[in-house]
Amino acid sequence: MKLTCVLIVAVLFLTACQLIAADDSRDLQKFPRRKMRDGMLNTKNTKRQCLPPLHWCNMVDDECCHFCVLLACV
């Protein structure tokens, strides 16, 4: 009986921790590399130049505004 209560409390506590942490990191999960790069590059004097749609790109250092799919900006 005591073990069951301890397990229920532990599960509720861990669920609450997950919900609190999920609010803080909602947008960081999608594109962490791109957001980190944009944060370092976007200062007052620099602005990101986007490649036009259907322009060739690579997955490592893409400069597409949205996505690089099958080596082409979308």
Swiss-Prot record:
UniProt key word Disulfide bond: yes
Subcellular localization(s) per the UniProt record: Secreted
Keywords, sorted A to Z: Cleavage on pair of basic residues, Disulfide bond, Knottin, Neurotoxin, Pyrrolidone carboxylic acid, Secreted, Signal, Toxin
Signal peptide limits: 1-22
Superkingdom of this protein's organism: Eukaryota
Tissue: Expressed by the venom duct.
A single cellular component GO annotation: extracellular region
Disulfide pattern: 50-65, 57-68, 64-73
Keyword Secreted on entry: yes
PTM-bearing positions, type Pyrrolidone carboxylic acid: 49
Propeptide residues per the UniProt entry: 23-46
TM spans (from-to): none
Primary location: secreted
InterPro entries membership: Conotoxin
Molecular function via GO: ion channel inhibitor activity; toxin activity
Domain notes from UniProt: The presence of a 'disulfide through disulfide knot' structurally defines this protein as a knottin.
Family listed: Belongs to the conotoxin O1 superfamily.
Protein name: Conotoxin ArMKLT2-041
Species this protein is from: Conus arenatus
